[in-house]
Amino acid sequence: MKLIGYFRSSAAFRVRIALNLKGIAVEHASRHLRKGEHRAPDYVAINPQKLVPAFVLDDGEVLTQSMAILEYLEETHPEPPLLPNDPVGRARVRSLALIPTADIHPIQNLRVMAYLREKYEQSEEGTFAWSRHWIETGFEAYEASIAGNRHTGAYSHGDQPTMADLCLVPQVFNAARFKVDMSKFPTIQRIHTTCMKHPAFDAAQPSRQPDAEP
């Protein structure tokens, strides 16, 4: 199996964490998003969405969209689980995971930033302000959902990492890039610190990837 990603991609970061947690060894390849390598014809033939990650199975089948890949890994490699056993718990974890992946990331990723610059002549500070607004809006919802909740433990749900944490941590890394004041989100900060002490999260972070840049 092969994961095609980019060191700074939040979506690829989620999948790397899952692979590490489940002990799944795969080949890693990179497409440099800022250089437009994800739009090259050979990659578009693999993933017409022109996004990373793409997850190539041993039989040549290609999976796209990080959440679909996470669900595939959970179904094919159930241990350790990324979802709780109970229906309510699974729904809560998926709901939390969708805050970063559906409410935040799609409106502040690289292609949105590029569109704001090119179409609306936004400066870097303008695009950063846009990103900060949407990250903070999403984090306000995430923080309110986990702070004081009886299901919250060392991690977003209970005392083991779940799919929610795999989606939260990459977004916290993005928040640092866009200079978000994280002091407003103490529970998120605590959980992020806990996650980054886990070898699976630490090894998946952008700076530890072969294609990492300053």
Regions found by a protein language model. Name each.
Residues M1-G126:
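GST-like domain detector, emphasizing the conserved glutathione-binding G-site
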Residues F13, G36, H192, A212-E213:
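Generic structural signal for helix capping and beta-alpha/helix-loop junctions
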Residues L33-R34, Q189, Q209:
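Conserved beta-strand edge residues that scaffold enzyme active sites
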Residues A45, K197, P206:
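Phosphate-coordinating loops and pocket residues in cytosolic domains that bind phosphorylated ligands
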Residues E74, Q171-V172, Q205:
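Active-site-flanking alpha-helical
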Residues P100, I104-K197:
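GST-like fold's C-terminal all-alpha helical module
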Residues T162, Q209-P214:
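Carbohydrate-binding/catalytic loop surfaces
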Residues A200-F201:
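Juxtamembrane membrane-interface segments at transmembrane alpha-helix termini
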